Structure formats: structure tokens, C-alpha cells
Curated annotation (Swiss-Prot):
Family (UniProt): Belongs to the universal ribosomal protein uS14 family.
Gene: RpS29
Chief location of this protein within or outside the cell: cytoplasm
Co-factor requirement: Zn(2+)
Quaternary structure, from the entry: Component of the 40S small ribosomal subunit.
Molecular function as annotated in GO: structural constituent of ribosome; zinc ion binding
A biological-process GO annotation: cytoplasmic translation
Organism: Scarabaeus laticollis (Scarab dung beetle)
Cofactor note text: Binds 1 zinc ion per subunit.
GO cellular component: cytosolic small ribosomal subunit; ribosome; rough endoplasmic reticulum
Name of the protein described by the UniProt record: Small ribosomal subunit protein uS14
Length: 56
């Protein structure tokens, strides 16, 4: 096993390591509700485009 094969060689089928943001591929702060699968930073950026409205 070379150096390239060691990292990320374990299968990721479930859990936090298996899911990533659809916009930036980040794995932290993921919003999965309603099937968004987008991290919270990208959600703040794209919320209006998706259709979320900020209420006063």
C-alpha cells in the first residue's frame, strides 16, 4: 500500500464522513433537512436562490 492508498481507503457508506456539501464538498456543518445536503456557510450564501425568505 503506497502513501496515496492509505488516506481515505476505509469505505464511507454511512455516517458523517459519507456526506458532503453539494456546493463546496465540505463535510462540516451540513444541513440535511428537506434533502438540502448543503453546509451552513453555503446555505447562507444561496438561501435566497433556493427560495428561503428571512422573516422579520
Amino acid at each position: 500500500m503506497g502513501h496515496q492508498n492509505i488516506w481515505y481507503s476505509h469505505p464511507r457508506k454511512y455516517g458523517q464522513g459519507s456526506r458532503s456539501c453539494r456546493a463546496c464538498s465540505n463535510r462540516h456543518g451540513l444541513i440535511r433537512k428537506y434533502g438540502l445536503n448543503i453546509c451552513r456557510q453555503c446555505f447562507r450564501e444561496y438561501a435566497n436562490d433556493i427560495g428561503f425568505k428571512k422573516l422579520d
